[in-house]
Amino acid sequence: MDVPARVSRRAAAAAARMLLRTARVPRECWFLPTALLCAYGFFANLRPSEPFLTPYLLGPDKNLTERQVYNEIYPVWTYSYLLLLFPVFLATDYLRYKPVILLQGLSLIVTWFMLLYAQGLLAIQFLEFFYGIATATEIAYYSYIYTVVDLGMYQKVTSYCRSATLVGFTVGSVLGQILVSVVGWSLFSLNVISLTCVSVAFAVAWFLPMPQKSLFFHHIPSSCHGVNGLKVQNGGIVTDTPAANHLPGWEDIESKIPLNLDEPPVEEPEEPKPDRLRVFRVLWNDFLMCYSSRPLLCWSVWWALSTCGYFQVVNYAQGLWEKVMPSQNADIYNGGVEAVSTLLGASAVFAVGYIKLSWSTWGEMTLFLCSLLIAAAVYVMDTVQSIWVCYASYVVFRIIYMVLITIATFQIAANLSMERYALVFGVNTFIALALQTLLTLIVVDARGLGLCITTQFLIYASYFAAISVVFLANGIVSIIKKCRKQEDPSSSPQASTS
């Protein structure tokens, strides 16, 4: 009588080991990778010197001219980001995230080391290239956590990881402002602190667990799932009983596994090698399917167009502030403005969750109105020669964009699997960067028009105004079509009775 009991316990233990290899136990396994990733995100974004980058480059430390900074150095970041985005997107999935996160940390270290010690135009252009690598590899940070936690934890861990970057950026901005305005530290000292923080982030990244799967190239084979497990689209496992029932001592496993003493132990199948051609074929089919949806296409178009303009305004806002009030002649509050705009934007984003609106009906009109407000904010920032008006307009600009991009993200992600959401996110960002590259090449780059900073912002305001006109026309057409559809059912009975 003891033998079956021992065999039963061995079978239960073997099943438990198999589940531990192929599944993720949300209550026990999610905390460590989430905490490590949040720590990485916090320190990687804790960069007190970033709001003061333009004054630092124009100041005595680097002694560069405005034309060199705006028209020859900053465009390198845009070109690098675009060039690297798609290869990094695929490499992130193929290498399973952690190596790319380490690459991001290393790129940040190189960027801030060069910011401290590199001199000359060419060296700073190389610096911008490494910063482009760091920006392109951000996708690994935001995707990693979905491969090491249970599906039911996605919402919670997403909020934790995004909050970590938000808090890190805000703390860095406030710290930089205090050290400059109150303590009187030099901008060089702020870069030393930034280098230290990104080095800490790089060290933390080494302790991240290596994921066993990814969205596209490294799916968990379905034969490994066992115990009533079904493979879902993101490679995780869904069982027909609650996950909590399996946790305490794995008691539930023993009753679900048929025992056969004559059968040898079952060997776990090896993970199949990724079929690259199949992956690209699936990506292409998903691309066609996703963008054939009119609502998704509408939100994606706004995402790409507005993100292009947002990047341009944020990248060159410090240059406009420097023009309105040179940092050599007065105190500057760039760090405080970045912190305030981030906090108010986060508060507004939180409030979005409580908005009750039929986005299918009024979404395009909302995009029109908010794009028009963004255009007005950028125009005021450019034309009113007051630094405080510039600061206030910038805060309004960032709040509106953060709210709308949150709504767009939700509208796009609501009915997509994780793979398709990652694909749409990557495609939208790539289109935004392609447009930004074109805009930079024509308006900013010294090889193009090489316009002054105030003329650039006038063009950006006109750009957002054009976006608002597009969505106004599209919104009117959509509302008219919807009204006609609502009238058709009521008119058909009248026609039949007559």
From Swiss-Prot:
Protein name: Thiamine transporter 1
Function (record text): High-affinity transporter for the intake of thiamine. Essential for spermatogenesis. Mediates H(+)-dependent pyridoxine transport.
Membrane-traversing stretches: 29-46, 72-92, 106-126, 129-149, 165-185, 187-207, 296-316, 335-355, 361-381, 387-407, 424-444, 457-477
Glycosylation sites: N63
Organism of this sequence: Mus musculus
Phenotype of the disrupted gene, per the record: Males are infertile with reduced testis size and aspermia. Spermatogenesis fails at the pachytene spermatid stage with apoptosis of germ cells. When fed on a thiamine-free diet, animals develop additional phenotypes including diabetes mellitus, profound hearing loss, and defective hematopoiesis. Pancreatic morphology appears to be normal although insulin secretion is significantly impaired. Erythroid precursors in the bone marrow are almost completely absent leading to loss of reticulocytes in the peripheral blood.
Residue spans, topological domain Extracellular: 47-71, 127-128, 186, 317-334, 382-386, 445-456
Record membrane topology: Multi-pass membrane protein
Keyword annotations from UniProtKB, A to Z: Acetylation, Cell membrane, Differentiation, Glycoprotein, Membrane, Phosphoprotein, Spermatogenesis, Transmembrane, Transmembrane helix, Transport
